[in-house]
Structure formats: C-alpha cells, structure tokens
Amino acid sequence: MRARDPDAEGYVERDGVRVHWQQYGQGEPTVVLLPTWSILHSRHWKMQIPYLARHFRVLTFDGRGNGRSDRPEGAVSYTEREFAADTLAVMDATATERAVLVALSCGTLWSTLVAADHPERVAGLACIAPAVSLAPPHPERVVHSFQEPLGTEEGWAKYNRHYWLRDYRGFLEYFFARCLTEPHSTKQLEDCVGWALEVTPETLIATEEGLLLCGLERFRHLCARVRCPVLVVHGDQDAIRPHAQGAALAEAIGGRLVTLAGSGHLPHARDPVKVNLLLREFVESLRAMAR
C-alpha cells in the first residue's frame, strides 16, 4: 500500500543496464528525486513523493544495484559517472528537458556532475546530508580499513568488505542506527534494513569500490563549475557525515545552507514536513525566477 501510486513508469536501458523509473504528478518544473547509495532504492523518498507531486511533476528511479533496476557486476558499473549518465537517460526517456535535482548523501556526487557537465538540463540542485569530502570526516570513520581483514567487529569496524560478507545484516543494523540517531526511529530503521536486504553484500561492495569522486581538489573544481541555484540541508547531529561537510559544500558551490537542529543523516525520513516545505519553497523560488 502506497500513499501515491505512479502515474507512469517504465525502464530505460543504457549500455545493457535497465533502470526503472516512475513519474508522479504534472506541471512544471520537474523534480527528480535521485538515487543515493545503492544500499537503498527510491522508496526512501516515500515521504516526499505524495507531497511534492501535488505541486510539481516528480520523477524517481531506482539506482543501479537496487530496487527494480539491474544489478551489474563490478565496481566499474557503479562510478559516479554511471549514475550521472543514468540520470540523463531517465530524463531523456521521460521527455524531461530540464529539472530540479534533489540528492541525498552520496547522490550529491552524481547530481553535481550532471549540474556541472549539463547546466542546460538543471534548473536547481538540492543536496540533503551531502556526503562530500570537502571537510574532514568523523574521526571514528577513518580508523579501520575497508579492504583488509580486521581483528575487531566493534563499531565502524563493521564498515568492512569482509564483515559485510560474513554478517551483512549486522552491518545494516549498525549503519542505519547511526543514520537514524533521532529518538523513536524504529519504523525508519526497519524500512531501511528491509530495503537494504534486497541488495547482496557483493553488489554493495562493488558500489563502495566504484565511488571515485572523493578527492578534495577534484570535487572542488567540479563545484566551481555549477551555475544553478543550490540548497544544502544538513543536520547538526549527522553521525555519518559531519555538518561541516554540508557547510563546506554550500561555500564551495555558492549555495544556501539550512541547518536542521537535532537531525541525523536521514532528515527527509525523520522530519519530512520540514524537509518537504524546504524543497517546495526552493522549487517554487526557481519557478518564479523563470517567469
């Protein structure tokens, strides 16, 4: 049971990989709710879709590796440029000439690529809890190797390919508990773990190894090429990506920063009313500018 069923849906195939998309609502502008890390599919936007579709045309699609999209093998299939190209393919398949892109976490990487390389296609960019290496990470996240076997399974040592293959659910429960630091997050935690179990640990390892756009100067240069209006929303209690990374992105890209007091890494799930109103206000401001 969903609060809002899609008005249209389909697949677009690019280089042998099929990507599933859904469309909701009508009117201009179009808002594309982008895939995040393929640990989650597009259902993580379920609290945004019904509200935004009452005001705009909304597109979502499952990122490669999850949902109803294909799961190609190998890290080369999960680079930022592959996700960016999928975004453009979905826009083309749905006759979407221009759109406002909304990204969560590492979705910021491919949304920024699209905005920088194809400015004529992007009217605006909203980044929620951006996972960008423009400021230092939380210290506890850089203690352990992802690739090497570890002698501990405590804390962030679970963010390790060998642990994922051994106790995938254990990793998911830990990771999403850190994403959802707000009290009373049981439903959101259950949703996220359930969705993530639709992905195999082998696929998730490939997605992690495919993220190449993490070099500081390289991403700074990309940000400097973005010309559209940008909104950055970041919680000050984000245990995955520190608030300083969102602040640094807003500065580097010339965007507006909104800080959500007490929010963790998934504010669109835990405080959807506030996030939805921010997104609507941002999109409507772009529509007014276009008149």
Whereabouts are the PLM-identified features?
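Conserved alpha/beta-hydrolase "acid-adjacent" motif
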Residues: 239-245
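Short beta-strand/loop motif that positions the catalytic acidic residue
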Residues: 226, 232-234, 238
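Catalytic active-site module of serine/aspartate enzymes centered on a nucleophile-bearing elbow/loop
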Residues: 254-291
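Conserved alpha/beta-hydrolase catalytic His-Asp/Glu region
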Residues: 158-217, 221-222
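Conserved HGGG/HGGXW glycine-rich cap/lid loop of the alpha/beta-hydrolase fold
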Residues: 17-72, 76
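Flexible "cap/lid" loop of the alpha/beta hydrolase fold
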Residues: 112, 116, 123-162
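Active-site loop/oxyanion-hole signature of alpha/beta-hydrolase fold enzymes
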Residues: 46, 60-106, 277
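Alpha/beta-hydrolase fold catalytic core
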Residues: 1-35, 54-56, 96-97, 280, ...
